[in-house]
């Protein structure tokens, strides 16, 4: 394959073509993915995000993989929406350890009218800290989507999870079409899309191909494509599911990189179960984004210091954003926190 063909951006992938990618010899697939990756990205830079659960547990959805679903007894404590100030403090800490994007996740089917003002203030406050912002709040109306865009939200995460054909085996409380509609609203509002899926739920290779086809054949590719490895949690229906073969996981990352050459492909949930060699292969396959910090919503994530040690051994550096001088930026953080503390738009989680 010529270099120009290898980096072509397409939106017309067929199942037969994607199957052929998955069926390549492993070394050939990784070579192709790395070639595509180098055409668009510095191969030794990885974008670093931090994810905070701003509202945990008691979700009305029945996603079989999720410990936050109210349908399953996983021992997870239910928590109400975090106070805006506490979210901003967590964002400032994320900034201090090197994150460039702060992602906020709420266990909702959709945000309520009473919660939206607090969510919008979180976006505005995190933006003032100099971080990119991302949220995952469930299904959105067109009006809610526009309000988030007006507040300055950069990314909205709404995963497709799996192929349309396998989807009904995992979720029954939200349709695939509703997920696609939310993504369309996000794009229409001018925000960037973060959307991917989960491996290890009992899906076939064709289902993995089908997920990537749905994402790559959108009118515009998602700017961020998180590929999660199922974190099996006791109490969920998928707790005893068979482990994903590490090479199959790496293959999926590589195919995602080839199909969506300009997207950040995120090595997302499941890193706690991956050894350093598997993570290194993931970066070779074209993954160039990770979540950074102690927890990924409600499951363990490798500690930040451990991540930086691995980066140093591999010669990888965090992707940077254009920043102010340190003292100017620190002053901006402190001022934003003071302004938010004095704001009347403050969610008292204890009294709700």
UniProtKB/Swiss-Prot annotation:
Gene Ontology biological-process annotations: biotin biosynthetic process
Ligand binding ([2Fe-2S] cluster): 103, 134, 194, 266
Boundaries of every Radical SAM core domain copy: 44-262
Pfam families assigned to the protein according to its UniProt record, in alphabetical order: BATS, Radical_SAM
Keywords carried by this UniProt record: 2Fe-2S, 4Fe-4S, Biotin biosynthesis, Iron, Iron-sulfur, Metal-binding, S-adenosyl-L-methionine, Transferase
Source superkingdom: Bacteria
GO molecular function terms listed in the Swiss-Prot or TrEMBL record: 2 iron, 2 sulfur cluster binding; 4 iron, 4 sulfur cluster binding; biotin synthase activity; iron ion binding
EC numbers: 2.8.1.6
Annotated binding of [4Fe-4S] cluster, by residue: 59, 63, 66
Family assignment from sequence similarity: Belongs to the radical SAM superfamily. Biotin synthase family.
Record function comment: Catalyzes the conversion of dethiobiotin (DTB) to biotin by the insertion of a sulfur atom into dethiobiotin via a radical-based mechanism.
Name listed for the protein in its UniProt record: Biotin synthase
Gene it is expressed from: bioB
């Amino acid at each position: 394959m010529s270099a120009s063909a290898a980096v072509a951006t397409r939106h017309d992938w067929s199942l037969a073509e994607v199957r052929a990618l998955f069926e390549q010899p492993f070394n050939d697939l990784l070579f192709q993915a790395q070639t595509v990756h180098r055409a668009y990205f510095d191969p030794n830079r990885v974008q670093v995000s931090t994810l905070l659960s701003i509202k945990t547990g008691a979700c009305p959805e029945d996603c079989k993989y999720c410990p936050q679903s109210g349908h399953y007894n996983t021992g997870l404590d239910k928590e109400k929406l975090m106070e805006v100030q506490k979210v901003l403090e967590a964002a400032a800490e994320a900034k201090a350890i090197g994150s460039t994007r702060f992602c906020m996740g709420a266990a909702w089917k959709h945000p309520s009218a009473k919660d939206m003002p607090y969510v919008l203030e979180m976006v505005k406050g995190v933006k003032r800290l100099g971080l990119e912002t991302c949220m995952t709040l469930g299904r959105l109306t067109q009006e809610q989507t526009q309000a988030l865009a007006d507040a300055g939200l950069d990314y909205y995460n709404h995963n497709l999870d799996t192929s349309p054909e396998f989807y009904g085996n995992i979720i029954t409380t939200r349709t695939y079409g509703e997920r696609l509609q939310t993504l369309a609203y996000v794009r229409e509002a001018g925000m960037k899309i973060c959307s991917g899926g989960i491996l290890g739920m009992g899906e076939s290779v064709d289902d993995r191909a089908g997920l990537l086809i749905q994402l790559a054949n959108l009118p515009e590719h998602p700017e961020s494509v998180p590929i999660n490895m199922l974190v099996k949690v006791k109490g969920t229906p998928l707790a005893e599911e068979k482990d994903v073969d590490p090479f199959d996981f790496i293959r999926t990352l590589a195919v995602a990189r080839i199909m969506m050459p300009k997207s950040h492909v995120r090595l997302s949930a499941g890193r706690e179960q991956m050894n350093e060699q598997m993570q290194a292969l993931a970066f070779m396959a074209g993954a160039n984004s990770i979540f950074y910090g102690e927890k990924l919503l409600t499951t363990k994530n490798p500690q930040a210091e451990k991540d930086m040690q691995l980066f140093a051994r591999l010669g990888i550096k965090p992707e940077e954003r254009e920043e102010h001088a340190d003292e100017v930026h620190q002053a901006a953080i402190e001022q934003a926190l003071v302004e938010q503390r004095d704001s009347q738009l403050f969610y008292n989680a204890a009294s709700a």
